[in-house]
Amino acid sequence: PDFEEVLHNVKVLDIKQNQKKLRMGQLKGNKFKIHIKNTNNPVEDKDIAEDVLESLKVTGVPNFYGFQRFGEVRSTTHLVGKCLVEGDIKKAVDTYIGNPNKNEHNQPFEARQLYDEGKLQESYDLMPKSMRYEKSMLKELILSKEKHGEITEKDYIRAIESLPKPLKRMFVNAYESYLFNKVVNERSKIGINKYLPGDIIINEEERWVHEIDEDTIEDDMNKFTLNPTGPLYGSKVPYAEGKQGEIEKRIIEEENITKESFKCPKTPKLGSHGIRRSLRFKIEDTSVTKTCDGIDVEFFIPRGCYATAVLREIMKKNI
């Protein structure tokens, strides 16, 4: 079949047979070509972007999670996750179903507003089909209220459990990502491209390196064969030592939670052990081209990394 006629804005470069089928996560990375329009001065901005990309090739790109991790219209996914970690299930449900955002269309906005006012059936009736997950949760609450005359914590838990497993898992994962971004931001102030004693280091296969060779660590860091990590917080994730470890501990303390909180005792299936994630990623095959109204930026980055992290470094130069 002609895939390009079926898949719009997709270009098929090559098709090959393989003895093993492809699985999620097996890609090496992604190549991007992004147009930044309405820049101040395309000629100067091209030079600025090239300088930024050359610098990032040396230091690595801060491994921030992109805004899409938290919800593009309503950035609430991580807030729901925080409520689950804190054990406030009612607040988690209220945050997901209610809490309207001014960027939403009128119908979803009004439906969420009705929920916040306690008008559950009216809210349900007004919700469009696109809000199927909110409707699924709300249906549980309405049935419970009709049956028992009130909504208990168990009912709110059932409302959460009515969601598909990937979505349920996303809440706490998004909160972990939010906290990780805080770690990256703080660690960037003291350097993400150098080894600090006490760092927990991973190699290119994302495996922990338990023995650090002081004679070669700087060269390994420069080659990106080794990278420092930060915590995706969880009940079993270890902290680094030294100043960077103090940063990691302070960030979670400021949230008024502990590692144990990530066991999510009221919704244990949604708990997380946590892992360590690289604080930076390698960027390759970069180029910048001037256009009539801006610049085109091209680059290749590993899987699991966000192009928005690269754009963040370019755009903060006020191009």
Task: Identify the role of each PLM range.
Residues 305:
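ATP-binding Walker
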Residues 1-294, 298, 302, 312, ...:
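Extended, charged/glycine-rich binding lobes that contact polyanionic ligands
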